[in-house]
Amino acid sequence: MILIDTPLWAAHGTVFAHLVSDTSYTELHDFAGRVGLPARAFDGDHYDVPAHRHAECLHAGAALTSSAEVVRRLNASGLRLRKRKGDRGILRVLSTRIGPGSRSDVDLVASDRPVDPALVFAAMTFIRDRQGAVAVTWSERRSEWSVPGGWREVDETPAEGAAREVAEETGIVVSPEALAPVGWERFRPVVGPSRFAPEVDLMQVYAVRLAETAPRLRSEPGVSRPPEWASPEEFALLAAREFWWPLAAYLLR
């Protein structure tokens, strides 16, 4: 069911309502497409609807309800993406395969603020060269193209772990201080064993821009496919089906 609350949230010189579905994101996106809401109005689990478009949504079939009921219905449906104020929700991916016999709901969020390091179990880094190409790496364990990343080691900060993974997987040396936070992912297991503690379930996402154009990349021992530089369009051909790709697409736009 499509629900909308009253426009009360002030921003950009107007007030906004929240348009949600308590059934599926597909239903929500289909409705938004029919009424002509732009993709940029989507914030992870809802569309922000300016006051002047509110009546149009009601006329198209959205049910008017309270803000509290919107939150309650989202929570009950499992479609709510929890994030900090000011962060941008990209997508909540439901029951995606994480490993053998394991599935998680994953929240993809863009943010230039780091998350609490105590909650971070891993990090990944988008490395771009002077021309905007992306350093992509092959994961033997997951059998997919991605960007450098991995689990933190004992006593590492998230940025230190990310810089280490970059060096190990590409041969590029960057200082932890050069890595800018650009987003995070939250993993909530729903099927099978969890590989991390419930209270330590965030992956910090970083980005760094190099001054050089396509510096030489070094392959990590034991990896069957060497790292390479790819344009964002080429990277999409390699990885667009992965659960994390919507966040990557947003960051590489």
Model segments located where?
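NUDIX/MutT-family hydrolases
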Residues: Q204-A207, R216-P246
